[in-house]
Curated annotation (Swiss-Prot):
It comes from Schizosaccharomyces pombe (strain 972 / ATCC 24843). Coiled coil: none annotated. The lineage of its organism: Eukaryota, Fungi, Dikarya, Ascomycota, Taphrinomycotina. One of its GO terms (cellular component) is mitochondrial matrix. One of its GO terms (biological process) is mitochondrial tRNA modification. InterPro entries: Asn/Gln_tRNA_amidoTrase-B-like, YqeY/Aim41, YqeY/Aim41_N. This is Uncharacterized protein C22F3.15. Pfam families: YqeY.
Amino acid sequence: MYNTYAIIVHVSKLRNSHLFANASAIPNLQAVIRKKLLDSMKSRQKDVASTLKVFLSEIEYANKSSKPVTTDLDVLRVLKKNIKKRKQAIEQFRKAERLDLAEKEESQIQTLRQFLPEHASNI
């Protein structure tokens, strides 16, 4: 029915991709976000998957800076920074009367807020 070789090659490419490499060497929160990304891709939630892909790429970018992301606190730092940036974008979109883009940013913030601890979710 399925070409077994093609499936093995596909799975090995997934393991070697930058999103899923070194799963044991990453913080727990980052692993949870990657799991959520996989789930959203499987259930075809394009908006959620897109938001999480962008966030994971920002973590990768932060890893290449002077402050690499090595703990959950570092992931939270990047997450809070990302949410703050999106809030500023919402303000700019509302000033420009682009309510459609503001709503899109708000939904992306809601996607990211689910990874904040309860006491920090009011950010």
